[in-house]
């Protein structure tokens, strides 16, 4: 039940992606990107809705062709979550999706074209009140920067970003955020640190092409965790070669671990050993599966024996400490007379957790209406 994070957020300006506030102390937004063919409207809409169901604040959609832009029009009309159009190479696609109500435009400085093309996109975005993300990527830096630096470096990524920040500044356009992603953790982290010192615009965090579900989650947690702990970051995306739904789950888990933003249950569980009085691993796995729909932020400790169980239960909303045949149950750190049969733990705990989540949600609603 540790509520406050010691992290002090980097000051930044405020923009909006649809109805989602970004920067200036707003909650860090978690986003993902569809991996369907955008021209397959049905599949893309289904995936966006699945992402929204697990808490995605923003969803990015690749729009590589004019046909995809026409599909985007239908997709946008079919979903409620804010959509970012991912644009490369052809600036005219950005102009087209702007007509169709896109909530944000992501452009890549490495391939979007000359300043005149950027000017066209900016003027369109200004007219329609659409923010822009300048998305620098270590894998697609401008040729002159690669010639200058020989390889992606923090200085190269920074120069690419600032080159386009300066263009937007000259055009008096301040509704933008910036990212400087790389697949190497140290390269990405140092690039963001340099950028954070240069501008006050919101920063979108990510370790690009991080890898598969396990390795990519670890790499992202290490890199983004370093930045978030320093107060850097206003939105984030976990790039996994996996189901995009997993990106949202990992993103919230990272924020939850730093006490920056919580959604759903934070399970505190022992890895289990010979002292466990019930099967901790299967119990936790089943509860995680059953309780994915719970959005109330709460801590649940599930410990297999009395060594650490009571201590963890003291700082949990719901706690379970393994005992012989029956396990001890705690509510808000207080030991309850009720004990749970070890053969029926999952059903018993699920009921208690759901009741507690409902109680806590009602408490929050009452507080909001009285303030």
Swiss-Prot record:
Q: How is the cofactor bound?
A: Binds 1 [4Fe-4S] cluster.
Keywords carried by this UniProt record: 4Fe-4S, Iron, Iron-sulfur, Isoprene biosynthesis, Metal-binding, Oxidoreductase
Q: What InterPro entries does the entry give?
A: Dihydropteroate_synth-like_sf, IspG_bac, IspG_bac-typ, NO2/SO3_Rdtase_4Fe4S_sf
**What's a single GO MF annotation on this record?**
4-hydroxy-3-methylbut-2-en-1-yl diphosphate synthase activity (ferredoxin)
Query: Which pathway does UniProt place it in?
Result: Isoprenoid biosynthesis; isopentenyl diphosphate biosynthesis via DXP pathway; isopentenyl diphosphate from 1-deoxy-D-xylulose 5-phosphate: step 5/6
Residue positions binding [4Fe-4S] cluster: 270, 273, 305, 312
On whether Metal-binding is a keyword of this UniProt record, the answer is yes
- Enzyme class, first EC level, given as a word: oxidoreductase
Pfam families xref list: GcpE
Please name the GO terms of the biological process aspect recorded for this protein, alphabetically.
Answer: isopentenyl diphosphate biosynthetic process, methylerythritol 4-phosphate pathway; terpenoid biosynthetic process
E.C. code: 1.17.7.3
The record lists the catalysed reaction(s) as: (2E)-4-hydroxy-3-methylbut-2-enyl diphosphate + oxidized [flavodoxin] + H2O + 2 H(+) = 2-C-methyl-D-erythritol 2,4-cyclic diphosphate + reduced [flavodoxin]
Work out whether the entry's keyword set contains Iron. yes
The record's family statement is:
Belongs to the IspG family.
What is this protein's record name? 4-hydroxy-3-methylbut-2-en-1-yl diphosphate synthase (flavodoxin)
Give the source lineage, highest ranks first: Bacteria, Pseudomonadati, Pseudomonadota, Gammaproteobacteria, Alteromonadales
Q: What is this protein's gene name?
A: ispG
